[in-house]
Amino acid sequence: MQLLDGKITSDQIKEELKTKVEAIKAKGGKIPHLAAVLVGDSGAAVTYVNAKVKACELVGFKSTLVKLPETITEADLLAKVAEINADKDIDGYIVQLPLPKHIDEQKVTEAISPDKDVDGFHPTSLGRMVLNLPTYLPATPYGIMQLLERNGIETSGKHCVVMGRSHIVGSPMSILMARNTNPGNATVTMVHSRTKNLKELTLQADILIVAIGKPEFVTADMVKEGAVVVDVGIHRIDDATKKSGFRLLGDVKFDEVAPKTSYISPVPGGVGPMTIASLLMNTLQAAALK
């Protein structure tokens, strides 16, 4: 068993980006600028956004954090989105999800200019991805593709089972893995909460990508010997023995599944850092298009 270490792989990407930014600076070009919109102060969201801002600084990007109160109206948030769309200095931005219940996430996502949609959630971005046209790929699936490619995982002709069908991970992941690209060219099966023969299908997976949002759902008896397992889940579980008061778990029961695998991504330190690296790659692309 080998670890698909997202921290090591994302650090490689950040070093490459840092070199590119230094070259842009040397030529007197525009430094890529990523903005993040944070509504409210939920602990997990603050942690994610701070990690994104820190990563920007590390590679030499300019970053802006827009903090808004949880009580903000939908209209005021949409006005802020329109303002960022019009800001010529900002190359790309994200609106950190989830948003408070009184705000329509889809409406906000669709209000983001596709040119600045570095999270890759806008219908235009997703449509272009399906057609294999140049676009911003959704950050987490893009990060997983990079993790597979940079660790030399063969995907062509393999059976890839994607657990979960969200538009953020599961659906785009299944499309990317089936495309005539490298990585890609896999035979893809998507399973979800209504799948009747779940275990039968997961046991056929050469590559198992798990994004179902249930802590430690995937157990050793669901995974075939030598499979590649990518765990997208991340859950905060209360733990009084930890200084932070919680521990992080994935969707896969790591300790019992890991010995059966050829490669497995840990939680934390697997997909999470790769999502941030992909966001930076998309932002550099956005800046280059200007």
UniProtKB/Swiss-Prot annotation:
* GO CC, any one term: cytosol
Q: What is its EC number?
A: 1.5.1.5, 3.5.4.9
Q: Which UniProt keywords apply?
A: Amino-acid biosynthesis, Histidine biosynthesis, Hydrolase, Methionine biosynthesis, Multifunctional enzyme, NADP, One-carbon metabolism, Oxidoreductase, Purine biosynthesis
Which PROSITE patterns does the UniProt record give?
THF_DHG_CYH_2
Cysteines engaged in disulfide bonds, as pairs: none
Q: Catalyzes what?
A: (6R)-5,10-methylene-5,6,7,8-tetrahydrofolate + NADP(+) = (6R)-5,10-methenyltetrahydrofolate + NADPH; (6R)-5,10-methenyltetrahydrofolate + H2O = (6R)-10-formyltetrahydrofolate + H(+)
**Which proteins does it associate with, and in what oligomeric form?**
Homodimer.
Q: What name appears for this protein in its UniProt entry?
A: Bifunctional protein FolD
Organism equals: Cytophaga hutchinsonii (strain ATCC 33406 / DSM 1761 / CIP 103989 / NBRC 15051 / NCIMB 9469 / D465)
Give the source lineage, highest ranks first: Bacteria, Pseudomonadati, Bacteroidota, Cytophagia, Cytophagales
